[in-house]
């Protein structure tokens, strides 16, 4: 059972989602509908995008806690650009560029300057948040044009253009990691950095690329946030980094690197969003969301650690049991002296 859970984290997350769906369906029979599914998917888009970026970083055995601030900074960037008269495409591209530069800077700190990822991104978390507040003067950005809001307006099968783009990104990144040598380089880098270097993997480039793509995904999440609510508060992105990490760990991405899939992280993000919908259904205050996210993250980390220890213990027991069985068999085998009385008598005479 432990091996099944350890080796099928995506299936376990999917089972949890289906179980939660079933429980909510019992509470509210109107919950089972296409509208409910599309609503949850729309709500999960920001977390899904952040989970995609966090997966790339965590696979390389790093972590980025500045993505919430990058999300807020890029949301402010697109909002200010639009209000300054720039077009929608130019504003979005500018925000994506800002996110990529922010992620690239994180990668430089970790890869070239050898600063631990958690320390480097804690510093840039405050740096990017402060820059966001400097740009806005601590004020909200309102009056965003309708063009931006149209990105989150349902068009086909009740899914918005951003929703279709998100699904395309999921499929593309899943294929990249699972079917290309470049994608497998992320796993090799996180599993054994020195070994990957000896095999010719450009580990520094892989890690910088992971952080840069994480910044791009955070920027895209900021654009989605602005398009969904139509304004940009001065606290945009607060706490999203913890939810992104929780979604990844919940979906089977190891904090030790080299393990997990994009699909698992997406399922984790979907499950966390579904939990938020439960809070709405139960009419609990919104501030419970952060508490639940932290509780889920802590619980999953404890469970993951205990599960990994249990699996490793079982593997050791099986290995030692095989050696013990071989030793017992060798002890029971008759020796040459046991089968040859003459040899036994010579041995006794020698003694």
From Swiss-Prot:
Keyword Cell membrane: yes
Primary location recorded for the protein, binned into one broad class: membrane
Chain segments annotated as transmembrane: 14-34, 39-59, 70-90, 93-113, 115-135, 155-175, 213-233, 252-272, 284-304
Record-level Gene Ontology MF annotations: transmembrane transporter activity
Record's keyword terms, sorted: Cell inner membrane, Cell membrane, Membrane, Transmembrane, Transmembrane helix, Transport
Its membrane topology: Multi-pass membrane protein
InterPro entries according to UniProt: ABC_transp_permease
Coiled-coil segments: none
Entry keyword Transport: yes
Disulfide bridge partners, by residue number: none
Location relative to the cell: Cell inner membrane
Residues of the signal peptide: none
Gene Ontology CC annotations of this record: plasma membrane
Subunit-level organization: The complex is composed of two ATP-binding proteins (LsrA), two transmembrane proteins (LsrC and LsrD) and a solute-binding protein (LsrB).
Chain's role: Part of the ABC transporter complex LsrABCD involved in autoinducer 2 (AI-2) import. Probably responsible for the translocation of the substrate across the membrane.
UniProt cross-references to NCBIfam families, sorted A to Z: PRK15432.1
Homology family: Belongs to the binding-protein-dependent transport system permease family. AraH/RbsC subfamily.
Entry protein name: Autoinducer 2 import system permease protein LsrC
Organism: Yersinia pseudotuberculosis serotype IB (strain PB1/+)
Phylogenetic placement of the source organism: Bacteria, Pseudomonadati, Pseudomonadota, Gammaproteobacteria, Enterobacterales
Gene: lsrC
